[in-house]
From Swiss-Prot:
Region (Disordered): 229-267
GO biological-process terms attached to the record: neuropeptide signaling pathway
UniProt-recorded name of the protein: Pol-RFamide neuropeptides
Keyword tRNA processing: no
Record's signal peptide: 1-21
Top-rank taxon: Eukaryota
Propeptide residues, chain positions: 22-52, 62-64, 74-77, 87-90, 100-103, 113-116, 126-129, 139-142, 152-168, 178-181, 192-194, 204-207, 217-220, 230-287
Coiled coil: none
Chief location: secreted
Length: 287
């Protein structure tokens, strides 16, 4: 056998022994490797220094240091840096071969700090806020996790996820049950349609706008379910006709432009105000 064959045989044997590193002590494993190399090179009348030179050219460092770092103890940061292109601590080996991966390794692996809570969440427990922050670029709360994995989602999560108002029907289909009243109450409060849409879009909105926004003509039933009974019970609200079933008034408003609708709204509000008549009462004083 030539020198190259012996070297390949020696390195292959080292790799096989390296797999069993957890079961053998560092000193015993190192001695076995040295004996194998010394035996192979003695038969070829070569010194261990020759192998050092070859391995140095092959791996860029002294063979003894490489063998010690590769098989006799935890891999050094220098070897790992050359092997994986980054700095890895000895703690990485413990995590790699059956022990918990420490924060230092996770920082190098994922480019951020990762706590032990992340590991617990990654392999069967709830993910911590720190992990969610790194994973999704924002602070992930426990409420988000509950909503993500089958429980009610907070109003902040729904707003970030969908960027729009979520109706009862959508929430029912999304989470398999009726959304809590607290959720919708937090989103819409007790505001009527006119005020809510004005705050959200900065203007009064008509049925034409709603049609363009939602792709269909919103019915009284949908509006009633979406905003509750607050507007319906408000007699002074100009949009009350949409909830009371007055189709004539609704059609008249739909065919009018927004400016006329505003004018009519003002007229309606004025007409609904009670008119107080002045009455003079004469009181005769009798002596």
């Amino acid at each position: 056998m030539n020198l190259i064959t012996l070297l390949v045989l020696g390195v292959s044997t080292c790799l096989i022994y390296g797999i069993e590193a957890d079961e053998k002590t560092s000193s015993a494993l190192e001695n076995e490797i040295v004996e194998i190399l010394n035996g192979n090179f003695k038969n070829e009348k070569k010194s261990i220094e020759t192998s050092d030179q070859w391995l140095k050219g092959r791996f860029g460092r002294e063979v003894n240091q490489w063998l010690k770092g590769r098989f006799g103890r935890e891999l050094s940061d220098q070897w790992l840096k050359g092997r994986f292109g980054r700095e890895l601590s000895d703690q990485w080996l413990k995590g790699r071969f059956g022990r918990e991966v420490l924060d230092q390794w996770l920082k190098g692996r994922f480019g951020r700090d990762a706590s032990n809570q992340w590991l617990k969440g990654r392999f069967g427990r709830e993910l911590s806020d720190q992990w969610l922050k790194g994973r999704f670029g924002r602070e992930g709360s426990n409420q988000w996790l509950k909503g993500r994995f089958g429980r009610e989602a907070s109003k902040n999560d729904l707003e970030k996820q969908n960027g729009r108002g979520d109706s009862d029907q959508w929430l029912k289909g999304r989470f398999g049950r009726e959304a809590r009243k607290q959720l919708l109450g937090g989103r819409f409060g007790r505001k009527d349609m006119n005020q809510l849409l004005a705050e959200r879009h900065g203007r009064e909105t008509s049925d034409q706008w709603l049609k363009g926004r939602f792709g269909r003509q919103l019915s009284d039933q949908w509006l009633k379910g979406r905003f509750g009974r607050e507007v319906k019970n408000d007699k002074n609200n100009p949009f009350r006709s949409r909830y009371t079933g007055d189709s004539t008034q609704l059609q008249r408003e739909n065919n009018q432009p927004i400016e006329e609708l505003r004018d009519n709204t003002e007229k309606v509000s004025i007409e609904n105000k009670p008119i107080m008549k002045k009455t003079s009462v004469k009181i005769s004083k009798t002596v």
